[in-house]
């Protein structure tokens, strides 16, 4: 790490980004049953706060998870995200998480040009890293920013 990237504890570091995962992480507690009003309010609050990325939830397979038992943010359909953000004409980027083995990523993750999503975060365990790499490569080819959570 070069000296030009060093900072003090409280200095501004443009290379550090803030991602709010309230919906995705909180959805594990309430089965993703957030109202559109709550999601929209959180979206607007994150914009005002200068958050870099807002994670809306998962890209989970509707073949593996019952849509009647989970709220829409378990699946993050494009139309549902757009209902909240429109074309997202803000500096904040939109993120979703996809778990290895729990999403049909080739079908459920659209080409970036057809989506308001900017970042796909792939969650994996050590033993499923090869499958995670396949998912990351697919998302990258589709035009997304990508990260991996191990």
What are these model-derived regions, one by one?
Residues 27-34, 68-72:
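A short N-terminal beta->alpha junction/helix N-cap motif
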Residues 1-11, 39-48:
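Short amphipathic alpha-helices and their capping/turn segments at secondary-structure boundaries
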Residues 31-41, 124-131:
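Glycine-rich anion/phosphate-binding loops
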Residues 19, 43, 136:
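Short glycine-/small-residue-rich flexible loop motifs, especially phosphate/cofactor-binding loops
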